[in-house]
Amino acid sequence: MAEFPKEFVWGAATAAYQIEGGATEGGKGLSIWDVFSHTPGCTYRGETGDVACDSYHRWKEDLALLQSMHLKAYRFSVAWTRIAPNGGTDWNEEGFAYYDTLVDALLEAGIEPYVTLYHWDLPQALEEKGGWRSEETARAFASYAAKMAEHFKGRVHQWFTFNEPACIVKMGYGTGEHAPGLKLPLEGQFTCWRNVIYAHCLAAQELRHADPENKVGFVSTGRICYPVSEAKTDVDAARVLTFACPDDDWAFTHTMALDPVCLGRWPEPDICGPRLAASIAAVPQYINDALPLGKPDMVGLNIYNAAPAQMGENGPSYVERPAGYAHTAMNWPVEPECLNWGPRQMQEQYGLPMFITENGLSCTDKVYRDGKVHDADRIDFLARYLEKLSEGIHAGADVRGYFQWSLLDNFEWHSGYRERFGLVYVDYATGQRIPKDSAFWYGEVAATNGQSI
């Protein structure tokens, strides 16, 4: 039986572009994902988030699903372009009205909103002025954060500024797999990275200035390595590989995201590749001076898998997985130890309260002849992962809550609607929601604080 702290938070997570739809309704402006998804060849089968799960119109159904699962927290993101259609300070009252209604309904239902301000949908108008290549975008984000904090004062206290800078920068400005689809060299990518970090620091100050009771968080994803044994040499080897920042794999590291915001400094040169180290050395002093001001109250960790590691003859090394190892429909390895060792490593490095802000898997779900969705693979996956999370907490990781990804099947970015991550099945032709077996299972987990696992 898994055991969790008495006040542990159980929730589910979504993101605006992935579920809302209503792409041109309510005064909303164009985001980079509106443009990118309509560009031929950029998404699976040319699919877009124009309608997605239609949560813009069907949010009451989503609220009922959260209630049915006994969840006390909902992590969702705000579409920046609903609030500021062109990314400036011409605020859109219709956008505020939509989120007012959602937030008020959540609070009335006893569900606390955990609001993410940026989950990848940059206003297209800002991208045309340089996007994350420009510090002006960081300043625009701070204005947006200030307005949100002012508007929702007394109602929203849990804020995450950014979701996964690794994906924002590496996939959007490096590989081009995500919006805006650029392929910049490392140096250009790092300029975007430092501007995202700068934006967080500026926004954190605005959120706290608006309401000292606000809690500010920052969500990271990246490489996790776990030791193949409890031997100190293997434990140390896994830690070295987790936090290393080589030039060929620097972005998908928690180090690059969390060192600047949690420790107030960039990663040390001895763990960085030479090009990355040179880019860090060239960061303007005023950005470095802002770093300590961005220290979060909580760290969000999006963790899905990990890599086994050991101390080899020539130093820390990865261990090859066995033939036929378990993997998800998205071909991600199934590695429950990630929720044990990942939080433990982050606790040792940063010493801050943590939330698992995303964890889950894509399955080849279908509606059976009985009209139900039987996703035994997801239940087994979540049970194994949550057992390991419990182990990590008992080993000293200060994890305060868990948000399953995701409440709904949704638009999975460049993969379109091919992948199904939800606890709830969505028929995209009709918008119908069908709770999967895992939704009922997870509801029992939340109701019993994990004792049913």
Predicted segments, located by residue:
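Aromatic- and Gly/Pro-rich amphipathic surface segment
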Residues: 30-64
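Glycine-rich, proline-tolerant flexible connector loops at the mouths of alpha/beta enzymes
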Residues: 78-91
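Generic alpha-helix structural propensity
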Residues: 54-61, 69, 78, 94-101, ...
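A common structural microfeature
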Residues: 7-9, 56, 73
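Catalytic domains of carbohydrate-active enzymes, especially glycoside hydrolases
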Residues: 58-79, 293-299
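Active-site region of glycoside hydrolase catalytic domains
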Residues: 1-43, 86-88, 96-371, 377-453
